[in-house]
Amino acid sequence: MSTGPFPSSRREESSVSAPSFRFSQRKMLNLLLERNTSFTQDFPRSPGDKLLDSTNLSILSGGTPKRCLDLSNLSNGEMSASPLITSADFDDTGSLDSSGPQDVQLTEKNHHQDPMKGIPVQLLCSTPNALDHSHRKKDAVRGLSANKENINTNLKTLQWESPRIPRFQNTPGDPLASPLPLLGNGVSMDTEVRSLGSPITAVPKLSKNLNLEDQEEISEEPMEFSLEDHDTKECVLPTVSGKHQDLKYITPDTVAALLSGKFQGLIEKFYIIDCRYPYEYLGGHILGAINLCSQKELHEFFLKKPIVPLDIQKRVIIVFLCEFSSERGPRMCRSLRRKDRALNQYPALYYPELYILKGGYRDFFPEYTELCEPQGYCPMHHQDHQAELLMWRNQSKAQEGERQLSEQIALLMKKGVSLP
C-alpha cells in the first residue's frame, strides 16, 4: 500500500539523522572523558593513586561482573552490554583494570622500588593542590573501609602512600631547610638525635650530699683568699702550713731561735704580740711578749707611728699568738694587715712579714718553759676567771661590732652615698 511521497522522505531523514545522532553522542562521551583526564595542577599520580581514586571505586566494589554499556544504539532504543576485560596488572599508562578476586600487585617497569627511596629528602612547603589531593585520598580510604566485605584482603598493601616529587627543591645552604633526618639515606630519626651531642647531658651532676667539713671549707675560702698577699719577697723565717692558708705559720723552735738572736743579721726588730686576755697573760707568757687583746690597741701601737728599720737590708717582723693560735691570734693579724694595706699604696706595706705561732702558747710552754715569764700556764676557761672571761668577751664583741660599722660607713662614703 502506497503511502505517498512523505513516508519515504521521512525514512530517508531518519536514516540520515541516525549517524549524526550517534556521532554527537560519541562526541559528548569523548568530551566527558577528556574532561576527566585533563591536565591539572596536582602532582604526578602513580598507579597507587589511581587505585585509591574515587573514580575507580566502582571497579573495586562488589564481586558482580562488570558490563560496558554500548551507547551507539540509543537511537533505536536498544542498549547492549559487553563484559569488561579485567587484568590484575597495570598497563603502560598506569591505569588499573579489575580482575575480581585476583591479587593486585604494584609493579613498575619490571622491577621493585624501595618505598623509602622515593620519599623526598626535605619538603620545604606544601601547596593547596597537594592538600586537596590528600583529602581525596582520605575519602577513598574511608570508602574502602566501609566496603571492606566486598574487597579482597590483599588490597591492604595499597594503603601505602606513593612517593611524590615536591615542586620546590631545597638548595644547599638554604636557611629554610628542614632539620629532619635524611630518610632517603636510611638514617632513622633516633640515630640522628643520638649523634647530636647535648651540652646539658654532658655536664656532670653536682653531689647534693656534701659533708659538713666541705661546706665549711667552701664558706671560708673566699674570706681567706681575699686577704692573701702575694708578696714576691722571701720570708726571713722558715714557715710551715697551718689552719689558715692565707697566713704564715712558724714553729715554737723558730720562736726560740728568734729569742736567742739567731736571726740578728736579717732582722732589726721583732715583736711577739700575745692576744690572750690579761688574766691569761699574767698567768704566764713568752719573754718579751706584748699583751694586746683589742684591735684598737694594736692599731695605735703599730700604725700611729709606724716602726721603720734603720737598715733597709733588715726587717721588722711581728709574731702573733693566743692560747691555741686558732681564732684570736689570726684575727688580730688580719686586722693589722687590712689596716696597713689601707694606709699604703699596693704593694707597699709597713709590716710585710706577719707570722702566727703554730699551736699557740699551749704548745710553746711545755717545750720552752724557761723562755716563759712567769713559768706557768693559765687557760682561758680557768675556773677562777669566769667573770673576767665574760667581761672580756662582751668587750671584744662590742669592739668588733664598732669596727664593722665603721668599715661599712667608710665604704659608703667611698662610693659617694650621703649619710642622713
Curated annotation (Swiss-Prot):
How is the protein modified post-translationally, according to the record? Phosphorylated by PLK4. Phosphorylated by PLK1, leading to activate the phosphatase activity. Phosphorylation by PLK3 at Ser-219 promotes nuclear translocation. Ser-226 is a minor phosphorylation site. Phosphorylation by CDK1 occurs at G2 and G2-M transition and leads to increased activity.
The enzyme's first-digit EC class, named in words, is hydrolase
Residues annotated as domain Rhodanese: 266-373
Instruction: Name the InterPro entries for this protein.
Output: MPI_Phosphatase, Rhodanese-like_dom, Rhodanese-like_dom_sf
Q: Where are the transmembrane segments?
A: none
Region feature (Disordered): 1-20
Q: What is its main location?
A: nucleus
Location comes to:
Nucleus
Q: Name one GO biological process term.
A: positive regulation of G2/MI transition of meiotic cell cycle
Q: Which residues form a coiled coil?
A: none
Q: Which UniProt keywords apply?
A: Acetylation, Cell cycle, Cell division, Hydrolase, Mitosis, Nucleus, Phosphoprotein, Protein phosphatase
Q: Where is the active site?
A: C322
Instruction: Respond yes or no to whether keyword Acetylation is given for this record.
Output: yes
Q: How does it assemble?
A: Interacts with MAPK14 and 14-3-3 proteins. When phosphorylated on Ser-126 and/or Thr-127, interacts with PLK1. Interacts with MARK3/C-TAK1.
Q: What does this protein do?
A: Functions as a dosage-dependent inducer in mitotic control. Tyrosine protein phosphatase required for progression of the cell cycle. When phosphorylated, highly effective in activating G2 cells into prophase. Directly dephosphorylates CDK1 and activates its kinase activity.
The protein depicted here goes by the name M-phase inducer phosphatase 3
Q: Which organism is it from?
A: Mesocricetus auratus
Q: Which gene encodes it?
A: CDC25C
